[in-house]
Amino acid sequence: MRGGGGCVLALGGQRGFQKERRRMASGNGLPSSSALVAKGPCALGPFPRYIWIHQDTPQDSLDKTCHEIWKRVQGLPEASQPWTSMEQLSVPVVGTLRGNELSFQEEALELSSGKDEISLLVEQEFLSLTKEHSILVEESSGELEVPGSSPEGTRELAPCILAPPLVAGSNERPRASIIVGDKLLKQKVAMPVISSRQDCDSATSTVTDILCAAEVKSSKGTEDRGRILGDSNLQVSKLLSQFPLKSTETSKVPDNKNVLDKTRVTKDFLQDNLFSGPGPKEPTGLSPFLLLPPRPPPARPDKLPELPAQKRQLPVFAKICSKPKADPAVERHHLMEWSPGTKEPKKGQGSLFLSQWPQSQKDACGEEGCCDAVGTASLTLPPKKPTCPAEKNLLYEFLGATKNPSGQPRLRNKVEVDGPELKFNAPVTVADKNNPKYTGNVFTPHFPTAMTSATLNQPLWLNLNYPPPPVFTNHSTFLQYQGLYPQQAARMPYQQALHPQLGCYSQQVMPYNPQQMGQQIFRSSYTPLLSYIPFVQPNYPYPQRTPPKMSANPRDPPLMAGDGPQYLFPQGYGFGSTSGGPLMHSPYFSSSGNGINF
């Protein structure tokens, strides 16, 4: 009977559990009037254990924490989240965000009476984060109403690098909008900064941002043109010195001397970074594409006209980037100034080439050969500049082994020392010159013809460490004549080390014996190529064509089964040798007799 009563009690408890489950799943623990439909089906797992086991289950902080996490994931507002019957709290629904946060904090403080330290710390951290977020949102929304008082109003959300709205009289409210922009950038929210001096406070600002800002600023009017030019130059100098761009709200109208000083500092920085060559008198990597004479410089900033000219407002970097690319026909015309067979240009055309540069740019060039004046810069093709020193260093690497008897490389003539007059041949003409021409019996690889050694009349690859490709235009490249020529005897040990021991040549145990080299070269029936001997002649009758011998030390243990065909007979029969000689040496059998020891 006791067991039956227990069953009845269990059934009653199960019915109550199903009722509770149905109530929680349908209405989320709330009356039907305020029931909220969750995003997904309400599973039993996130609820505390005393709901879906029985009412007397001991509660701990883990249950409450899981329940709160489930409520936050479901997306329910804090005021209408389901609470259990033991913790029903009369929470008023507060309309504003501040009241909602305060009520949530009060609930959390009431609920945290029976929690342990870890859950308290987690909840305090979460509350502090939500409080900071709400304060920041309220302050930003309150301060964004200040610039919205003007008839223009605020625009939609946009990235910070976009152009601000063009407002004629927008000089009245720069301060509050910049503060708002700083706070919103800390929250990683892209809001437009509505002012005439929009500055993105970011370390990742690029030249595109400066160009966009300068183009917008240039259309404002004529009264703040000098201030805009100073701000843009200051931005360029800060960007080049690799610091994040700060807002220049306190910058005054600079005079023309300050503008020229900033431009000169920018020019020096560009020269130090972009025109640094490999040596003091080396050319600075200027290819003929970059040696085109630039256009005459525009008017200086002290001669600014009264009309709003957009090109006058651009900073130095913007002028560099807005330069049109050079015409390929003009480049081809300048490349055809040199004769294709000679290394140095014609003197008259070289002087004519230099005479086309302005005098101010000749003074600014100096020893480095850079061509950058105060107002302009001659970087007509900036993406091609970093590749030129790499090509030149590669050329000097190839020419490192070929020296003249005087000790200087061949291509280093007096044109190279002259600084700006240095003009390499074009890449097209170099590729035309380097076509492989097979003259005589000497194989010429795809290297320039000037890369032959001066002391030995041989191609350059004879001095390198790797063997040449097998070109049979000369009889000295055949293997059977290599021992007769002392000039090419240096490659013999390399080719001996080239072949692995495949069982065909047992003489290769001593690879540097000249008699064995002569034997295995001249015993062949035809001319063997580089590494075809073990594969072309597998059945040639060599006298030592036997399995590899064991070591002569009798203390070595015999090899185990599976190591290869070491023995012709198994050890159990006691046959240790044949008539051809001993095949193995074992501590159990003697190699002197027939190997049978009983």
Curated annotation (Swiss-Prot):
Coiled coil: none annotated. It holds the Pfam family DUF4688. InterPro entries: DUF4688. It comes from the Eukaryota. This is Uncharacterized protein C1orf94.
